[in-house]
Design a protein with these regions (language model features):
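Active-site neighborhoods and metal-handling regions in enzymes and metal-associated proteins
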Residues: 1-224
């Protein structure tokens, strides 16, 4: 969000260091080097070598030394998705007696709440794509149609409209799976009398507009 860096490499150890002097340094793995160069405004990109016995937290400490941050107060985004418990323990151990640490997990999240005009435009574009996906649901939500076909058509119109993958899978269920609240791999064929529950998002440049619909197939019963 701060730099434009577009990757799912956050599932591995990587750190963006920002200091009060305006220095911005990314520590990441080699597979994300060109990703950062092509998608972000980060100029200083450092690589830690991913091999048996690697300790990227120690590589981070070298960067902190370079920035004269020893003995200073550092905020860490502990709630970051890629910072696993193991990596957090390694990070804490590396920085023990080196600097003081504060949990600043909400610092960026709170800033992101206030959207720019450009971001709002992205969300609105995502909403248009979500509506187009819903149009496909209405076309194919019929007896004898596979949930797979519905998902395929929804994703087709989103990608053809310039959209992206969503942050998580579309949630779809009918029959015995109609009340599930999470995606699972089994796909059903819609029955003569059924209920289709579907939750999805139109996504544009990773900005989402999410929707949910419950659609009776055939005649609605008293529960509906």
């Amino acid at each position: 969000w701060l730099t434009g860096y577009d990757t799912f490499g956050y599932v591995f150890f990587q750190t963006l260091v920002l200091d009060q002097k305006g220095n911005i340094i990314l520590l990441t793995r080699a597979p994300d080097l060109r990703q950062a160069q092509n998608t972000s405004n980060i100029n200083d990109i450092r690589i830690w070598v991913d091999k048996d016995g690697s300790k990227p937290a120690d590589d981070l400490k070298l960067i902190l030394d370079e920035l004269n941050l020893k003995g200073k107060k550092l905020g860490i985004e502990y709630e970051a998705y890629g910072l696993t418990g193991k990596n957090a323990l390694s990070l804490n151990k590396s920085l023990e007696n080196y600097c003081s640490i504060e949990d600043k997990s909400e610092l960026i999240s709170k800033l992101r709440v206030i959207k720019s005009e450009e971001e709002i435009a992205y969300v609105r574009k995502a909403a248009v794509l979500a509506d187009k996906a819903l149009d496909e649901v209405w076309k194919y939500a019929k007896t004898g149609v596979s949930e797979s076909k519905i998902l395929a058509e929804m994703n087709r119109v989103i990608f053809e409209g310039g959209g992206d993958y969503p942050a998580n899978e579309f949630i779809i269920g009918s029959g015995k799976n109609a009340l599930l609240c999470r995606y699972q791999a089994e796909k059903q064929i819609l029955n003569k009398t059924d209920q289709l529950s579907i939750e999805w998002a139109g996504t544009f440049k990773h900005y989402h507009s999410a929707m949910f619909r419950t659609i009776p197939i055939g005649a609605a019963d008293s529960k509906h």
